[in-house]
């Protein structure tokens, strides 16, 4: 074997790199990975770059330059190990020709506020990038590329995780245009020009990568179910790929929880209803509220339950950051709404203003873990007594 080059992008990439550096201590390797600020883990032989998430910054571009430089001019006997996890879309940025970092920031902000699913956002991002949608693997040719993936997307499609820098793109320019039109996205002129002219064309050729899934939402839910069963609870996994507006999903789950509590359907307590996936929050331009999709889901769930006895719930992002706040998520119980009102918070008003973080902070029911150094999407647990 020739050279071994380690590259990566995502909230878990530094932790993955440190583990690989330790396990392969007898292999001559080098490389560079990028992770979110505050998520770095020391690695002796692999350079760690920190950048901004969910909106990219100068270091996101610097990371792309360094990673592209690391894989250029490799030969057929060389091996590239790509460590990919959620968050890589904003951490690894190489704007399409004619676009700037400012353009990419504007695109990301428009996507994040639109209510689009993660799959839809990534379909647009791939068409505006010189590195996403398999282009990084093309740049590494003819070296062998092995991609180790931690999934944070519904359905675990590796082409969607971090916008698939080393995985063939199965979406098209027409898909991206349709998404922009459907969500009425206002994109900068340079991005509009790229889409109008057929998308980024930085690389051509077949994408070749051996992809291995090493962690996923379904694995996390299975582990949670095992812990629940060991503690005398009947676990029911409702799905690992749930999507939709956070407040709408919260309302639906309130109905499911009430059915379980009062009728024993789909399960009789003591039990726990588990689910994963990634909801979304559509934000009006003038929104000043604070909160992420997990706290908004929980506030909607609490309003739907309206103080029902014997039901508690927790929802959080497994990376430790719900949206852009310092909390992973929050938790609720039968007295949550009463405690909010006692603290001067009107729950329905807070939900309408997308201010769920403030509501849960007022009653000290935020869940704060700090960076977990992994990312397998959100996890929701509703306990039925």
From Swiss-Prot:
What taxonomic classification does the UniProt entry list for its organism?
Answer: Bacteria, Pseudomonadati, Pseudomonadota, Alphaproteobacteria, Hyphomicrobiales
| Primary role | Degrades an unidentified toxic product from the first step of tartrate degradation.
Its domain of life?
Bacteria
Please state, per the UniProt record, what induces or represses the expression of this protein.
Answer: By tartrate.
- Recite the UniProt keywords alphabetically: NADP, Oxidoreductase, Plasmid
Keyword Membrane part of the UniProt annotation: no
GO MF annotations in UniProt: glycerate kinase activity; hydroxypyruvate reductase (NADH) activity; hydroxypyruvate reductase (NADPH) activity
A Pfam family for this UniProt protein?
A: DUF4147
Q: Which InterPro entries match?
A: GK-like_C_sf (IPR037035), GK_N_sf (IPR038614), MOFRL (IPR007835), MOFRL_assoc_dom (IPR025286), MOFRL_protein (IPR039760)
Reactions listed under catalytic activity: (R)-glycerate + NAD(+) = 3-hydroxypyruvate + NADH + H(+); (R)-glycerate + NADP(+) = 3-hydroxypyruvate + NADPH + H(+)
Gene name of the record:
ttuD
The Enzyme Commission number assigned here is 1.1.1.81
The name this protein goes by in its record: Putative hydroxypyruvate reductase
Q: Which PANTHER family match?
A: GLYCERATE KINASE
- Which EC main class describes this enzyme? oxidoreductase
